[in-house]
């Protein structure tokens, strides 16, 4: 994945992923053949040209679309990713004794796959004295990657596999740090969930994370092990800044997402 990100564009990577799924999973249909014949970028352009209102997850995501397709005249409403504040309610979550062993861990909640970059996280944090907990199952076609992560991991790294979503608030509450050092995030739902549960977050600089978390997150470069390590240490040693959870509660509830989506539809109606 690191090699692909360095030498290929996102559209080229997506094209190769479709070919890989066709070969490895026998995923071949008329749609697949149409896609392969026309190409990723050309089909994207057709879709973009037909759009009345864009609903990106952030202003920076919209800027990338504009840059990629040279858009000059367009409507858009930024529709944020969000968190369920009823489920992820810090004051009403009680941590079960059965998971107290993981108290003050560095947590990563995500599928285990190349794009999420767990292998580089594990390489970066070797010899650090903290407990590291990975929650999530291997992504499709990433079983070998998962095994490589486990082989690389020292004894203070724990893989818990898939955990029921209702139990995640407990893990966020007991964790000291949550990390998503992915190759790209917009911004990563687990980072939002961890932040609203008053856990310091380490996030990738790739994507739209800074639109969401501003100066309250600890940023890292996914291809730089020292950058990941420094961010983890800084986040672990720092007290939690309540302004981060306040920001999530103010701007990134599902109600905010619904209102922004409605605004987008209203713009379409207003243009007709």
Regions found by a protein language model. Name each.
Residues 11-54:
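Membrane-proximal helix-turn-helix segments that form the acceptor-binding/catalytic region
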Residues 217-225, 233-238:
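Conserved acidic donor-binding segment of nucleotide-sugar-dependent glycosyltransferases
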Residues 68, 131-160, 166-167:
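Short, structured helix-loop element that forms part of the nucleotide-activated donor/catalytic region
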Residues 183:
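Aromatic "clamp/platform" in nucleotide-sugar-dependent glycosyltransferases that forms part
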Residues 55, 98-116, 122-129, 133-135:
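Conserved donor-binding/catalytic core segment of Leloir-type glycosyltransferases
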Residues 66, 82-103, 270-272:
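Acidic anion/phosphate-binding donor-loop and adjacent secondary structure
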Residues 162-163, 170-175:
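Short alpha-helical donor nucleotide-sugar binding micro-motif in glycosyltransferases
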Residues 198-203:
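Short hydrophobic beta-strand element within catalytic cores of glycosyltransferases
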